[in-house]
Amino acid sequence: MLKTGKKFHYTAPANGYPEWNNNPEIFQLNRSKAHALLMPYQTVEEALKNDRKSSVYYQSLNGSWYFHFAENADGRVKNFFAPEFSYEKWDSISVPSHWQLQGYDYPQYTNVTYPWVENEELEPPFAPTKYNPVGQYVRTFTPKSEWKDQPVYISFQGVESAFYVWINGEFVGYSEDSFTPAEFDITSYLQEGENTIAVEVYRWSDASWLEDQDFWRMSGIFRDVYLYSTPQVHIYDFSVRSSLDNNYEDGELSVSADILNYFEHDTQDLTFEVMLYDANAQEVLQAPLQTNLSVSDQRTVSLRTHIKSPAKWSAESPNLYTLVLSLKNAAGSIIETESCKVGFRTFEIKNGLMTINGKRIVLRGVNRHEFDSVKGRAGITREDMIHDILLMKQHNINAVRTSHYPNDSVWYELCNEYGLYVIDETNLETHGTWTYLQEGEQKAVPGSKPEWKENVLDRCRSMYERDKNHPSIIIWSLGNESFGGENFQHMYTFFKEKDSTRLVHYEGIFHHRDYDASDIESTMYVKPADVERYALMNPKKPYILCEYSHAMGNSCGNLYKYWELFDQYPILQGGFIWDWKDQALQATAEDGTSYLAYGGDFGDTPNDGNFCGNGLIFADGTASPKIAEVKKCYQPVKWTAVDPAKGKFAVQNKHLFTNLNAYDFVWTVEKNGELVEKHASLLNVAPDGTDELTLSYPLYEQENETDEFVLTLSLRLSKDTAWASAGYEVAYEQFVLPAKAAMPSVKAAHPALTVDQNEQTLTVTGTNFTAIFDKRKGQFISYNYERTELLASGFRPNFWRAVTDNDLGNKLHERCQTWRQASLEQHVKKVTVQPQVDFVIISVELALDNSLASCYVTYTLYNDGEMKIEQSLAPSETMPEIPEIGMLFTMNAAFDSLTWYGRGPHENYWDRKTGAKLALHKGSVKEQVTPYLRPQECGNKTDVRWATITNDQGRGFLIKGLPTVELNALPYSPFELEAYDHFYKLPASDSVTVRVNYKQMGVGGDDSWQAKTHPNYTLYANRSYTNTFTLKPL
């Protein structure tokens, strides 16, 4: 039955435990049957607007509630729900919220380990009892007068993790599953005028064994709470199917609705009708679909029709219609209306591949937790969600996995509207109950344990029923990292029996093959070579990486390798980066400084530190440099050079449904970063098609032997869209063009150098500069140009970077410690000075602390002040890989202006530079610091031809690579960065640390706990290296 209409009669569990402890079979009491997200309206016009909160049938209970906190069940107020209980002196708390962020209890971040393990040793299904906080909420409300004699329900959109509800002192019900709605029929509990609601929430319950997601462990009423009423006869639920025919041309619309006669009064001659409206609110059907009916208690009705050539829905073109369902009385007057958005699309496996509307789909995806740095998961607003979606769309992301629980319903509506494919994931993760490589199910939950079967099926049902009508959802996921077992087969069967329009996904079968509960082969953090190996095995299932490119700290190296594979092998159909946003909470240090906190910062144990910092965007919602790489790798267009000298290039359109002529095509040529010419036109390349592009430009001539001409091809929005304005660049590619070589340049004549030296120092003087070299240190200790001192400390070989999170994960800081010591401890073995008329050569042989490598530095100082530095390193092949090879020096903090011609404008690395443009870039040194959660290597620039570091007067150094260098200029040294666990703890800097490198090893990113940087981006010790560049004073 859909209703009770009567008060619930409570019976205590037979085992003597409360519902929330040691009772996995009890996951709800008196909860209403799950249904699609709906809200009754009084008119068609209201239904078309579909503004639920403006409906006369809606009443919010968000706001201030009275609140009592207890550390465990024994400390709670036992009779707080009684009508005579006085709660007026209790604290107040805002709903929705996490009580941990409102001054009670503490937030706790842990990944795999269950949060209570250090307080209590437990086995499932027992819940903690020693420390298991309980939040008790009370408030009053007066139902709207218009609701008299109508059914009334209360809807909790999200409560973590288990809760009881009382109305006016009477027990209404109980529910678990933190991330799907729990609704209760409270009609029979209400009284005239003011009513009192009491809610008791448990931080942990036996259901918490199913909610071991990698996130902050927080609790409370964290999503909207509201009342809603309905007419006595109303549409309780409805299901919409809007697929395409076999030719993907015409649409098939079918609607099924459950009609409920709540009070079972006689009803005759009702009419149920359906009308479809287009994006302009114009009727699509010539006449409404309708059927006449009478309803004594409840009834299901179905209607269907054929739609000629509807506008199709896809992430590229998210064309939506509005379906309005109306229930009318015998006189033809509206009793109520409901509505939802409809998108005509067909998602299926065809010829072994996942397809959307007949075309092979590639999921350019990301995993997303619901998170806000101030609110946690609580009260995430529509504006918060739109902010995320705009950034996703702007960076060519077309798919999102709701890791690892159903999101707020508004999220799916926005994905429908803006165009994102969704993997909707069941609220299930039990990572802490099993270990990798275990052979059997052992202690894995839910496994094949019968006591958990109905619990997990209820989670599937709650998600499915709420979300079934969203066109953006293409895949149901059974959960995350919960091993395998028969219960997953039951879950799989549930979805397959309910829904033929979507696929079912579960990565866990990779670890336990006894139950094949997935339509898709899915893995996590598999290296590109292993992904390719699957493609070569003649596989039967399409493949995705449901998690890959672990974006912890400075990461996402070699992302392009995966996308080369997705292009090469049709069976490989994309992946979802882990993850979208750093989960860091705003906190205040003892001195009042605001900072972003991670695990352990609240005294929480156990914790997993900054492992919550895996985002493509920072916790404050701003973009990190990593997402620029994602945008480039995910871009829907590919250009390749055919014959650049003749202006010939190949164009591949990766869109499935969009011709490239929908965009503006702009191409430019720049000389050393300065614009030479710019042209705009259109590219006419069919969806999923290729063509040849011919551009007309001359053979450019160099004026200087270092001149460089760069062609940039750019695809830009031709008009405003919902997610970006006209002119926004969607895709680009760059090519260095061939040019007619210039004659070698000859240095201008300058007066001869003056060289003075003694045992300790060497002083070189030119027309407007003086440089002092310390022979004992083997360094220049001063470089004075035009009465401005440019050096704070001299040039020294450096082989170390501030360890990244990936470095820590693969133990580089232990394995390669010798190179850290070699950077800090260097001894001069020999200094040779060779004065000439126009230059002086100073050769330094250094003994490094590790004694297994030979290091030489040669300085050639010319009479115009320019200095050429040649660094060579000959390591022993028995030594570990080298984090970086270069020279480090410092300047005064006043030299804060940085200009470079190389890749940028954001930081980039040997294995993460695809999305960084070769151009002329400018910024302050301070701006080069990337605020990762834990201070680490950041700010690097690759393929740098030249750079200047100057003060306000324009004094400083011009650095030129021979031919290129990597450059890093920050207010901190690598050793300072890695000495602190938060950026706010770093002391104010009085210098600029400049590192001019031959190379720095790549940042990696296959995972952040074991994977090393790929070999082709690693500086191995089995060869010699040379780093050459020049510095010239400005």
Curated annotation (Swiss-Prot):
Q: Mention one GO biological process in which this protein takes part, according to its record.
A: lactose catabolic process
Q: Which UniProt keywords apply?
A: Glycosidase, Hydrolase
Q: Identify the SMART domains for this entry.
A: Bgal_small_N
Q: Which reaction does it catalyse?
A: Hydrolysis of terminal non-reducing beta-D-galactose residues in beta-D-galactosides
Spell out the molecular function terms from Gene Ontology: beta-galactosidase activity; carbohydrate binding
SUPFAM superfamilies according to UniProt: (Trans)glycosidases (SSF51445), beta-Galactosidase/glucuronidase domain (SSF49303), Galactose mutarotase-like (SSF74650), Galactose-binding domain-like (SSF49785)
EC nos = 3.2.1.23
Active site location: E481 (proton donor), E547 (nucleophile)
One of the record's GO cellular component terms: beta-galactosidase complex
Q: Does the keyword Hydrolase apply?
A: yes
Assigned protein family? Belongs to the glycosyl hydrolase 2 family.
Name of the protein in its database record: Beta-galactosidase
